[in-house]
């Protein structure tokens, strides 16, 4: 019994020691939690510093990659190292978050729970121990009393001995029960103490796992640093990659000269200089002024010479006295240095203009600046551009009327000393032969020039492939001058074209400024682009209304008269600025065409085509030996007046000029054959418009081959006289009243 009591005392002491240890561990846990919180704060700061460090590290790696001295291998290795460090930084961020979320916060909560659990365990143990001790003490007291009583009874009968033995056994059992109770209390205390550390390990595991992952990324740095050590082992020796930089530089056009922006246009140069002077240094070095077979020193329309040369003399580039273009806003064209119509980067023979009022007829007047301003007519050439060959006389009455309204002469060489016009250059057979390698009759050149010069029109939905049409600038005034725009003109609103330049019989016209003759025109090459879509040449002055219907001309107008409805603008006469909105979708003026009648059959009247039509020359080499020549001389779409072909009309019969009859008689023989072949070609005229006219089935695919054939023998036929008179008479334009100021409109 005493031994059991000692055992119970020992167990009770052990339990109490365990409980005391648990209670004394709380400050340690709390200190650990505090230090972990500080570590988390420092790790967050480290993460932010690592991010900034790695950003700077990446810049160094990029610099190493792009620098010529450091090879790409070094830059690539540094980039890989930076990537690994960024991965380490990511894992460090994860470790920091796990430290707070998985360890610090849960441990702080568990410390409070541990305190409560230890206190409760101590209370329970004390209660059980007191109860067991009380029972043992009571039973022991009863046993002592029974022993005393048994001693007295020993002298007597001895009846109390069994009771005493039973009481002693009960006391022993109580001590054993107390011992067992103490053991259970100690076990609970040990489990509680152990559970705390188990919980701590559970909280610590995610933190350590994140740290291991972070440290696992560090192992990849070993290979990267080994590569960098090898790449940078010999800093004083260039590797092959650096030697390749020197090899690559050899043969390349590497220059340190900085390109300056184009200079602003000056008063003595074209307005196009602001957009055309950038590559002009190369054009000036490529010989833009080489003489041409025609005999005139001209400027090529090719890509090498299509920009204004910087080396042009300042004395010959005086600004035109009138810079007003009737339809384009302004002229921006020098009299002697004129930009070719189309800046397409093609060869010299295929560089053509497709302006709405300009054609490819004159082969000798190649570099004439054709502006719509009164002082720069198409027949006025510069001093260094005098053409060779005969000249085509212009209508003198128009010249005289034009001189009355013109200001002083423009740049040097444009006008004579007396202010009179230089004679108009004729496209001579020699010049054509020089261009095409064959001989062409004067009649062919005259007829082709007139048809292409005066009646060449373009479709409304055409898209020009030249720069000046979309930029607001105009290389040469390629729109008809018969429209009064915001910029005033010193001429009438009408124009008429003729073959021989004879005077009109129905009132003297006041000017003739819309016959644009381009420079360097190889007519045969432009024939290939007949069916290509082209853009209108001007941004203003073109009709916006639909094409006239098949009802024909107004009843009050003669059959060969096209009415243009224009009224003077009420806007102030200010120069139009460059518009950034792009070209206005407008339609060029249309001239009516009548199907021709072959002169060999005088009684034949071809089908009349009222309204506006265009004819495209096509070649029938078996039936017309001159057709290839005619197609070369006039490859563009030609519009003919509806009275130019067929039976003579009263206007055509009574219209010959005073000085043109003799010349007409001389050229009738040669022209008749041309007219006959031309009639066959015009018979298949290409209808113009957006489905407003039926397309004739007689027009087959436009041939692309242009086989030169010798001109036919001259023949003479009287019916050709009236037709040529009608051709020479041209189209008569009349004034009508309208509120439309955008473009001439053919009714």
UniProtKB/Swiss-Prot annotation:
Effect on the protein upon substituting residue 138 to D: Marked reduction in RAC1-binding, loss of increase in RAC1 activity and of dorsal ruffles formation in response to PDGF treatment
First-listed, main subcellular location of the protein, grouped into a coarse class: cytoplasm
Outcome recorded upon mutating residue 149 to D: Marked reduction in RAC1-binding, loss of increase in RAC1 activity and of dorsal ruffles formation in response to PDGF treatment
One family name in Pfam for this protein: IMD
Record note on what altering residue 148 to D does: Marked reduction in RAC1-binding, loss of increase in RAC1 activity and of dorsal ruffles formation in response to PDGF treatment
Coiled-coil segments: 135-159
Domain of life: Eukaryota
UniProt KW keywords: Actin-binding, Cell projection, Coiled coil, Cytoplasm, Disease variant, Intellectual disability, Phosphoprotein
UniProt KW Protease keyword: no
Domain WH2: 719-736
Effect of residue 116 to D: Marked reduction in RAC1-binding, loss of increase in RAC1 activity and of dorsal ruffles formation in response to PDGF treatment
Record's compositionally biased regions (Polar residues): 368-378, 480-492
Effect seen on changing residue 130 to D: Marked reduction in RAC1-binding, loss of increase in RAC1 activity and of dorsal ruffles formation in response to PDGF treatment
Single Gene Ontology BP annotation: membrane organization
Family: Belongs to the MTSS family.
Function: Involved in plasma membrane dynamics. Potentiated PDGF-mediated formation of membrane ruffles and lamellipodia in fibroblasts, acting via RAC1 activation. May function in actin bundling.
Subunit (UniProt): Interacts (via IMD domain) with RAC1; this interaction may be important to potentiate PDGF-induced RAC1 activation.
Disease connection: Intellectual developmental disorder with ocular anomalies and distinctive facial features: An autosomal dominant disorder characterized by global developmental delay, mild intellectual disability, ophthalmologic anomalies, microcephaly or relative microcephaly, hearing loss, and characteristic facial features including long, upslanting palpebral fissures, bitemporal narrowing of the forehead, arched eyebrows, and epicanthal folds.
Protein's name according to its UniProt entry: Protein MTSS 2
Organism, scientific name: Homo sapiens
The gene coding this protein: MTSS2
């Amino acid at each position: 019994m005493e031994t059991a009591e000692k055992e119970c005392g020992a167990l009770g002491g052990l339990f109490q020691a365990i409980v005391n240890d648990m209670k004394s561990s709380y400050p340690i846990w709390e200190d650990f939690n505090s230090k972990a919180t500080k570590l988390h704060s420092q790790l967050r700061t480290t993460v932010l510093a690592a991010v900034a460090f790695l950003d700077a590290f990446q810049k160094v790696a990029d610099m190493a990659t792009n620098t010529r001295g450091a090879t790409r291998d070094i830059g690539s290795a540094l980039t890989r190292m930076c990537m690994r460090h960024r991965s380490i930084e990511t894992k460090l961020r994860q470790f920091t978050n796990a430290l707070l979320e998985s360890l610090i916060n849960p441990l702080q909560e568990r410390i409070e729970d541990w305190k409560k659990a230890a206190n409760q365990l101590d209370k329970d143990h004390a209660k059980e121990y007191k109860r067991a001790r009380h029972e043992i003490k009571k039973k022991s007291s009863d046993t002592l009393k029974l022993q005393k009583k048994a001693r007295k009874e020993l002298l007597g009968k001895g009846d109390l001995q069994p009771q005493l033995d039973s009481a002693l056994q009960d006391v022993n059992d109580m001590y054993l029960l107390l011992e067992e109770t103490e053991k259970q209390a100690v076990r609970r205390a040990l489990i509680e103490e152990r559970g705390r550390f188990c919980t701590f390990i559970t909280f610590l595991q995610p933190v350590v796992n994140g740290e291991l992952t972070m440290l696992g990324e560090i192992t990849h740095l070993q290979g990267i640093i080994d590569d960098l050590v090898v790449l940078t082992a010999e800093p004083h020796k260039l590797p092959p990659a650096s030697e390749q930089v020197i090899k690559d530089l050899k043969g390349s056009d590497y220059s340190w000269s900085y390109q300056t922006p184009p200079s602003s246009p000056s008063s003595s140069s074209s307005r196009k200089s602001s957009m055309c002077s950038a590559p002009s240094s190369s054009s000036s070095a490529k010989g833009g002024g080489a003489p041409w077979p025609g005999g005139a020193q001209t400027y090529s329309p090719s890509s090498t010479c299509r920009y204004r040369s910087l080396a042009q003399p300042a004395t010959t580039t005086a600004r035109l006295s009138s810079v007003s273009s009737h339809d384009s806003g302004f002229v921006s064209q020098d009299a002697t240095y004129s930009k070719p119509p189309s800046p397409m980067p093609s060869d010299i023979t295929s560089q053509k203009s497709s302006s709405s009022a300009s054609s490819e007829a004159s082969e000798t007047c190649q570099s004439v600046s054709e502006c719509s301003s009164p002082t720069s007519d198409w027949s006025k050439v510069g001093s260094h551009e005098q053409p060779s060959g005969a000249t085509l006389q212009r209508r003198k009455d128009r010249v005289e009327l034009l001189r009355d309204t013109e200001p002083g002469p423009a740049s040097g060489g444009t006008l004579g000393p007396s202010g009179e016009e230089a004679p108009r250059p004729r496209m001579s057979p020699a010049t054509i032969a020089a261009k095409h390698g064959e001989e062409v009759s004067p009649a062919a050149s005259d007829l082709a020039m007139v048809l292409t010069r005066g009646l060449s029109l373009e479709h409304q939905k055409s898209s020009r492939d030249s720069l000046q049409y979309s930029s607001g600038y105009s290389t040469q005034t390629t729109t008809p001058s018969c429209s009064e725009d915001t910029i005033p003109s010193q001429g009438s609103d009408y124009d008429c074209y003729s073959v021989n330049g004879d005077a009109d019989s129905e009132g003297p016209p006041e000017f003739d400024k819309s016959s644009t003759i381009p420079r360097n025109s190889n007519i045969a090459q432009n024939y290939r682009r007949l069916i290509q879509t082209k853009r209108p040449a001007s941004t203003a002055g073109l009709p916006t209304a639909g094409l006239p219907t098949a009802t024909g001309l107004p009843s009050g107008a003669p059959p060969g008269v096209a009415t243009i409805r224009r009224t003077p603008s009420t806007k102030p006469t200010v120069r139009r600025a460059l518009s950034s909105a792009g070209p206005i979708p407008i339609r060029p003026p249309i001239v009516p065409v009548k199907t021709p009648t072959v002169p060999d059959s005088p009684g034949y009247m071809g089908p009349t085509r009222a309204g506006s039509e265009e004819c495209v020359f096509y070649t029938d080499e078996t039936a017309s030996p001159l057709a290839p020549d005619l197609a070369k001389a006039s490859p563009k779409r030609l519009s003919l007046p509806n009275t130019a072909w067929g039976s003579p009309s009263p206007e055509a019969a009574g219209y010959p000029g005073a000085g043109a009859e003799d010349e007409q008689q001389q050229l009738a023989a040669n022209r008749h054959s041309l007219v006959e072949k031309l009639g066959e070609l015009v018979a298949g005229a290409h209808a113009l418009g957006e489905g407003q006219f039926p397309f004739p089935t007689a027009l087959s695919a436009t041939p692309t081959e242009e086989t030169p054939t010798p001109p036919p023998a001259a023949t003479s036929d009287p019916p050709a006289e009236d037709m040529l008179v009608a051709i020479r008479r041209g189209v008569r334009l009349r004034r009508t009243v309208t509120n439309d100021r955008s473009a001439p409109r053919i009714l």
